[in-house]
């Protein structure tokens, strides 16, 4: 491929196991090629998950995803990006810029060569969007995990004065007797406190399931997990 953005020639060698190995003479070229290869291998997946993280699914999949988009946008970082980048390593922004430039380089090639474009884009009737370095750090919902579900569950047990059930269901190592801090009322947590959290981190649902049914399924799954 001939692409703009590299300081010199770089290589991607795919071994017999399908593992790509990147060779470049410049530190930032490595990240450029890594982004290019990620897009070459899974452009539709990363485009979909970027849209999921930024709350842009309804733009391509319809109004049934508005609720999930709304939830996702509650977790998108909206602070000052200059200060945010300063909180990372000295060259973190340049690394992210190189990586996303590599993604964009493949997107441009794929748009000019339809055979390289994943078939899912044609099936769903849209094209991949370009990336910015800020996208990499603004998206937070992809990193959300399950601890908050456990915390809410414990609070509800505490509200019912049944904290002993927590130890029977989920053993702690070393053993620990949880006590409700003085002045803390665990009963004030609203029933719907997890709704936006679960929607924001939910996988993309292509079944056209109504938002309330999707949320009910997510709540049931979270309860069983």
Q: Can you describe what each PLM-predicted range is?
A:
Residues 1-225:
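Substrate-recognition/specificity elements adjacent to catalytic centers across diverse enzyme folds
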């Amino acid at each position: 491929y001939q692409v703009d953005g590299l300081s010199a020639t770089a290589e991607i060698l795919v071994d017999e196991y399908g593992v790509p190995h990147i060779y470049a003479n410049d530190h930032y070229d490595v990240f450029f090629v890594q982004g290019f290869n990620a897009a070459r291998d899974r452009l539709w997946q990363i485009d979909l998950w970027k849209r999921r993280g930024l709350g842009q699914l309804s733009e391509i999949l319809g109004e049934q995803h508005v609720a999930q988009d709304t939830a996702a946008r509650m977790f998108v970082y909206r602070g000052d990006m200059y200060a945010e980048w300063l909180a990372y390593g000295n060259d973190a922004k340049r690394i992210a810029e190189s990586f996303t430039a590599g993604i964009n380089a493949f997107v441009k090639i794929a748009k000019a060569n339809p055979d390289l474009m994943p078939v899912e884009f044609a099936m769903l009737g849209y094209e991949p969007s370009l990336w910015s370095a800020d996208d990499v750090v603004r998206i937070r919902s992809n990193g959300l995990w399950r601890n908050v579900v456990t915390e809410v569950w414990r609070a509800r047990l505490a509200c019912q004065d049944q904290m002993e059930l927590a130890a029977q269901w989920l053993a702690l190592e070393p053993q620990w007797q949880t006590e409700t801090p003085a002045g803390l009322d665990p009963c004030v947590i609203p029933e719907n406190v997890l709704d936006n959290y679960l929607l924001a981190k939910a996988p993309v649902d292509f079944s056209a399931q109504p938002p309330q049914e999707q949320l009910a399924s997510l709540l049931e799954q979270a309860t069983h997990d």
